[in-house]
From Swiss-Prot:
Keywords linked to the UniProt accession: Membrane, Transmembrane, Transmembrane helix, Transport
Induction section of the entry: Inducible by 2-thiouric acid, and highly repressible by ammonium.
Role played: Able to transport with low efficiency all natural purines as well as purine analogs.
Taxonomic lineage from the root: Eukaryota, Fungi, Dikarya, Ascomycota, Pezizomycotina
Keyword Membrane carried by entry: yes
Family of the protein in this entry: Belongs to the nucleobase:cation symporter-2 (NCS2) (TC 2.A.40) family.
GO terms under cellular component: fungal-type vacuole; plasma membrane
Main location: membrane
Source organism superkingdom: Eukaryota
GO biological-process terms attached to the record: purine nucleobase transport; xanthine transport
NCBIfam families: ncs2
Protein name in UniProt: Purine permease
Pfam families: Xan_ur_permease
Length: 580
């Protein structure tokens, strides 16, 4: 084994500086090093209707195979575009009206920083550092890209609602929310504290982690994260998730009265813009080339933006006022620990860890690497530890928790390239996109209806990921019972998030108790946290040998029915007749 496949110390002779210089020179000065003999037309050939096309398979590039420089850059850009929508969506939502209610400057900064941090911390996962004199690693050594986690959005929006209602965040005389940098700083600091949980769990055996968090626990949890986010996305699709959506039909205009083209919430124009994005994504999947399929979400967003700009929905003032370049810590936020947020964020980190294990397993599979054994367990350990550290570093870099992205596994499978050089090129493009602040300003200026058409599809893919995880569950009576019980309360909390808001009536001056009650209330308002806790508890206490149903499947039911009809029509007679 070589490189990241090796578990023990690397005993191979190290390359000298001269070797590295000669290798780099060959990459830039020879045809094989620059473009090779790869069929680049494969990436750009669309699937035209009514045209019979010759199917051809591209060569597979393994983890450490030699790959032409141009191809590495091209596939790296494809990876960056595939994850772009997922990276920019959380900061846009958390900086918007459902989050900290920031202005354009802070929103642009968070989008830029999210891209930069994603690029830098993805490189940490790919590089895979060995912890000195231990058997532990930091990182997977695979094309494991990280981005801002969707699991944080639901908890963060609920927390900001609580902060504004309790006076932690300011409101004006009319009750309208004002920017709350203090609340965002509390989210960052509490996230850094809670990231220690994932770092600690990374030193446990991967087999023990899988036993504690099997698919029957992780599947419904991930599904409800996506389901809860789809509601906010649909509000944006119809015009915006701010105050104009809280009481539609009263004359309020979205996104605001001074917008370039304000309309009432739910107007046909808004619905049409979002549908254009949605339809473009479907067309790219049906007729697009391989590179278009992996970037279908971004292509749909681009088409929607072009039409919205032509129809006068874009506000260019933020783009014109934005600086040319940006970087981490251009803006900072006061760091404080918000006690009620600790319990919900601990649940978020459990979900992030479970997602990471599943995504790393999928990456090993599509990269044609072993998915069991010591090497695989080492990758899981390094990936979980790396993810915990990246979450800690992300918080210190003013960004919410990160998680391993699954959509890039589709890029690997589609392009048949699992090479880390393409992954490093992806990191390079993400950092470059983040540094150019005008690019982030253009993303922040995207109309809500266009963004909603994209995020509805994106969040639905999160929910479907949960369904895919649940498909690996054996549908025994025990597992059906666990899923039913955990879904019952979790789905109810997702549909009615304020169901537990009036349970506690304490109004004393014990701030510690008040913070604990607010934390419990915040957990109970997040359906995925309730489902995850119930699923984990029931999976531990219910015995594995629970009595099965007499009829276990549709085939058994049909067979029993046929036998009963042949044996006799009277109840209870079929069994005796068959025996006879």
């Amino acid at each position: 084994m070589d490189g990241p496949d090796q578990i023990g110390p690397d005993v191979r002779p190290r390359r000298t500086f001269g070797d590295r210089v000669r290798r780099a020179a060959r990459a830039f000065t020879t045809r094989d090093g620059l473009i090779g003999d790869y069929d680049y037309g494969f990436l750009f050939t669309p699937r035209l209707p009514f045209v019979k096309q010759k199917r051809r398979a591209a060569p597979f590039f393994g983890l450490e195979d030699k790959i032409p420089l141009v191809l590495a850059l091209l596939l790296g850009l494809q990876h960056a575009l595939a994850m772009l929508a997922g990276v920019i969506t959380p900061p846009i939502l958390l900086a918007g009206s459902s989050g900290a209610n920031f202005g354009a400057d802070e929103s642009q900064y968070l989008v830029s920083t999210s891209l930069i941090v994603s690029g830098l911390l993805s490189a940490v996962q790919m590089f895979r550092l060995h912890v000195y004199k231990t058997r532990y690693y930091v990182g997977t050594g695979l094309v494991s890209v990280v981005g801002t986690s969707f699991a944080t959005i639901t908890v963060a929006t609920g927390t900001f609602n609580q902060m504004y209602s309790t006076g932690y965040c300011p409101v004006d005389g009319s009750g309208n929310r004002l920017p709350c940098p203090k609340g965002y700083g509390a989210l960052l600091a509490t996230s850094c504290l809670c990231s220690l949980l994932e770092i600690g769990l990374s030193f446990m055996s991967s087999r023990l982690l899988k036993a504690l968090f099997p698919p029957i626990v992780t599947g419904p949890t991930v599904f409800l994260i996506g389901a809860s986010l789809i509601g906010n996305a649909m509000k944006d699709w119809a015009g915006g998730s701010g105050t104009c959506s809280s009481n539609p039909g009263n004359g309020a205009l979205c996104p605001s009265a001074d917008a370039p083209h304000p309309l009432p919430w739910g107007s046909a124009e808004f619905i049409g813009l979002g549908f254009l994005v949605f339809a473009t994504i479907i067309l790219c999947e049906r007729f697009g080339s391989p590179i278009m399929k992996s970037c279908a979400v971004i292509v749909g967003l681009l088409v929607g933006c072009i039409v919205a700009a032509a129809c006068g929905y874009f506000d260019r003032s933020g783009i014109d006022a934005a600086p040319v370049a940006s970087f981490i810590w251009v803006k900072t936020f006061p760091l404080t620990i918000y006690a009620p947020l600790i319990l919900p964020l601990l649940a978020v980190y459990m979900v992030i860890m479970m997602e990471s294990i599943g995504d790393i397993t999928a990456t090993c599979d599509v990269s044609r690497l072993q998915v069991e054994g010591a090497t695989f367990d080492s990758r899981i350990q390094g990936g979980v530890l790396g993810n915990g550290i990246t979450c800690l570093l992300a918080g210190l870099c003013t960004i919410t928790p990160m998680s391993v992205f699954a959509q890039n596994n589709g890029v690997i499978a589609l392009t048949r390239c699992a090479n880390r050089k393409a992954g490093y090129c992806c990191c390079f493009f993400l950092v470059v996109m983040g540094i150019f602040a005008k690019f982030a300003a253009a993303l922040v200026a995207i109309p809500s209806s266009v963004l909603g058409g994209m995020t509805t599809f994106l969040f639905s893919s999160v929910a479907i990921s949960g369904v895919r995880i649940m498909c690996s569950v054996d549908w025994t009576r025990r597992n059906r019972f666990i899923l039913t019980a955990s879904f019952a309360v979790g789905m109810a909390a997702t549909l009615v998030p304020d169901w537990f808001s009036y349970f506690f009536t304490y109004s004393g001056d014990n701030h510690a108790l008040e913070g604990l009650l607010q934390a419990v209330e915040l957990v109970m308002a997040n359906g995925f946290a309730v489902t995850g806790f119930l699923g984990l508890l029931l999976n531990l206490i219910l015995p594995e040998d629970m009595e099965e149903d007499v009829v276990e499947s549709e085939e058994d039911y049909e067979a029993t029915t046929v036998v009963g009809m042949q044996g006799g029509s009277e109840p209870g007679s079929s069994g005796q007749n068959v025996k006879a």
